């Protein structure tokens, strides 16, 4: 479904209005077929920069480019009709300053039909968020564990424990005050996530946070069991499709080598079939 035909999808203000209501549901998507599967079940779908690790085999999100995000954003947009499309701003596309962020955010939205962008950072990104929002770019913030900053955070560690809690809380307040319509809380203690949810006026979207958040998001390949390089503690595997897919591929390979595929029902005869029969 093209972005211009998506008349029923919620917008940023609709998502913001869900604060304190029925929890928001979100997953990542990178392809049209997967977007179609989740369209009727998610309030918004995120084209995450996790695509670099999940589909492109990178060991972090740092190598993801604008071109990659646009390509996958366009693919996901074709599969959505009812869910809002949000797209990640990749590393080095917005940190230089508000003007750089606006150029790249506007390009992402214009070329993909996304209804909002997501960017990582708290207090240090408040000025940029405010700049974007004032110029018509809805922003979903992302604080706590910010994967684009793993080299300075020392890896994929829980953020906001002990004396770090006040800093994460300050980040949440800053992005809300700057005009973000929602904020992702990644890998923070549940008690801190609950406090942030209670104190900020915008919806909190948890990933490794708390069931008390205003919504939840997971990487779809994690929860379906396709991505097996590692499994974060916060992931629940609702299906284990990776082994099923591998078993199907192994069966196909065995049948090809045994010449049992294709069978008679998979090939075409010399004569045209009778009218109404399958070719």
From Swiss-Prot:
Domain of life: Bacteria
Required cofactor names: Mg(2+)
Reaction equations catalysed: 3-methyl-2-oxobutanoate + (6R)-5,10-methylene-5,6,7,8-tetrahydrofolate + H2O = 2-dehydropantoate + (6S)-5,6,7,8-tetrahydrofolate
Keyword presence, Ribosomal protein: no
GO BP term (any one): pantothenate biosynthetic process
GO CC terms: cytoplasm
Active-site residues, as the UniProt record annotates them: 186 (proton acceptor)
EC id: 2.1.2.11
Protein residues bound to 3-methyl-2-oxobutanoate: 49-50, 88, 118
Keywords for the protein's UniProt record, in alphabetical order: Cytoplasm, Magnesium, Metal-binding, Pantothenate biosynthesis, Transferase
Single GO MF annotation: magnesium ion binding
Role this protein plays: Catalyzes the reversible reaction in which hydroxymethyl group from 5,10-methylenetetrahydrofolate is transferred onto alpha-ketoisovalerate to form ketopantoate.
PANTHER family given in the database record: 3-METHYL-2-OXOBUTANOATE HYDROXYMETHYLTRANSFERASE
Quaternary organization: Homodecamer; pentamer of dimers.
Protein name: 3-methyl-2-oxobutanoate hydroxymethyltransferase
Organism, as annotated: Ruegeria pomeroyi (strain ATCC 700808 / DSM 15171 / DSS-3) (Silicibacter pomeroyi)
